[in-house]
Amino acid sequence: MLEVLLVLLGYVLGSVPTGILVGRAYGVDVRKVGSGNIGTANVMRAAGKGAAALTMLGDMLKGVAPVLLARALGAGPWVLAAVALAAVVGHCWPVFLRFRGGKGVATGAGTSIALAPPVGLGMFALWWVVALASRYTSLAAMVVTVVSPFAFLLSGQPLPYVLYTVVGGAAVLWRHRENARALLRGTERKFGGRSGGGG
C-alpha cells in the first residue's frame, strides 16, 4: 500500500504546474506566449531568465522530492523507478491541467539526479553543453534522452533505473515530436532572453 501511495504522490507532485505558478507571479500566462508550453524555455520567452530559473528549479524538485522521500521510507529500486516515472508522467500529463502539461525535461533531470547523482548530474551537464552550443533546448533534451539509458547501463545502475530512462525517455521524446519536426524543417525556435525557444 505504501508503494502505491508513493507512486501516486510522485504523479501529484509532478502535476504541479510550476511554470504557470511562476508566470502568474510575474504577471503573465505562459500558455498564451510563444509555444504555449509551461516549461522553462517558454517561461524564459514569456517572463525572462529569473522566472525561467525558478521554473527549472521547481520542476527539478518535483522529480527529486518524491524519489528521495521514497528512498527515505525504504523503497527499493523498482519502486523508486516507478515513483520517478510517475513524476515525469505527471509533469507531461498533469491532472491539474486536464492532462496538458510540459515536456518532462527538468522533472526527468531531477529524478535522474535523485536516483543516481553522478550520472544524473552528468546528463544535466550534457544538456547544458548541447543547449548552449546549439541554442536549441529541444535538441539538448532529445540528445540527453537518447544518451541517458546508455549512461545508466554502462555505469552499472540497477535494471529498474535503466528501464525507467527508456520508458520515461520515450515519454519525453513523444512530447518533443513537434520540436523534432521543426528542427528538421529549420523552423525551431532558439533560446536566449525573451525571444528564445525550444519548448
Swiss-Prot record:
Probably interacts with PlsX. It is an enzyme of class 2 (transferase). GO terms for cellular component: plasma membrane. This is Glycerol-3-phosphate acyltransferase. The chain crosses the membrane at residues 2-22, 77-97, 113-133, 139-159. Its main location: membrane. GO terms for molecular function: acyl-phosphate glycerol-3-phosphate acyltransferase activity. It comes from the Bacteria. It catalyses: an acyl phosphate + sn-glycerol 3-phosphate = a 1-acyl-sn-glycero-3-phosphate + phosphate. Catalyzes the transfer of an acyl group from acyl-phosphate (acyl-PO(4)) to glycerol-3-phosphate (G3P) to form lysophosphatidic acid (LPA). This enzyme utilizes acyl-phosphate as fatty acyl donor, but not acyl-CoA or acyl-ACP. NCBIfam families: glycerol-3-phosphate 1-O-acyltransferase PlsY (TIGR00023). Its EC number is 2.3.1.275. It is a multi-pass membrane protein. Belongs to the PlsY family. Coiled coil: none annotated. It holds the Pfam family G3P_acyltransf. GO terms for biological process: phospholipid biosynthetic process. It is found in: Cell membrane. Pathway: Lipid metabolism; phospholipid metabolism. The keyword Transmembrane helix applies. Keywords: Cell membrane, Lipid biosynthesis, Lipid metabolism, Membrane, Phospholipid biosynthesis, Phospholipid metabolism, Transferase, Transmembrane, Transmembrane helix.
